[in-house]
Amino acid sequence: MDDEELSAKARRLAAVIEPFAGQVYFSPECHAEYVQLGFSPSPAERNGVALPDGPAYFCSRGSLLGQAPGDLVASAFAVFNPSVVVPAVTFGWSITDAAAIERARTDGAIAQLRRILGPDPAGIERVRDSLGRASTSLRVAGKPLYAGVLAQEVPSSPLGAAWRFADRLREYRGDAHTAAWTSAGFDAVEIGLLTELYWGLPLKTYIRSRAWPAAELDDGIRRLEERDLVRDGALTDSGRQAREAVESCTDRQCRPVIESLGDDFDDVVEVLAPMGREIRAMHGYPASGPHELASRFAGREI
């Protein structure tokens, strides 16, 4: 498998996994569980999708690391402004603990999948087996969030287990991506700005969800302009090549996943893709978003 085929498969897998695993952050069932622990409810909806409360998001995902302080959570998440993450986590741990919110996270994620897909959707046992095999024996070095999911108990139902294994692979690619952009010499603001343009979004739009103030965004744009990566609010050829190199480096780190799936790759995609469409149609995950790299690279919709 050459690098081009690897990238196409790695991005396609990431795209079909994203709504299935990532729906945990938009699940009304999760939000309700977090309210029971003392967090605020979902602050708003966007196109019918319930957005997460900030402290609940940081603590629920951060619970994969155990009772981790805010600085550690900010380090692992990498792209968020630590000055927002740290107090949010400090508040969260004043009202609950990692074990309680991790249980709420798991229960809420599975509950939404059951509500939308049913308790035993077609093909889920095959997906469970394939993703379980692919997600169990990956190296944990430099992969803190993947290692955190790996340490969690696997739910007993095929649907719950498939979600857990998909969450492992989602975090594995996320950890790999962090390694790719940090080793390429970018900071969180710079990679966020480059990524907006790479996705075809205007500057200073999506990155605002990462809580960076305007002054830091402006400084980041200036640094990218000085490196001839951005000019007049658009990527230069060098900027596009640099950002694509980050994505390709991420893909290469996912080679063990693709090789482990082997001949089951197409089956996993064929089962998960319609599930993802149904999750989005039922407002369990944003209907469109930044996780469409696979279709862009392969030149086809998923």
Predicted regions located by residue number:
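Phosphate/adenylate-binding glycine loop and adjacent helical scaffold
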Residues: 1-218, 287-302
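Accessory, usually C-terminal, subdomains that scaffold auxiliary metal cofactors
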Residues: 210-287, 293
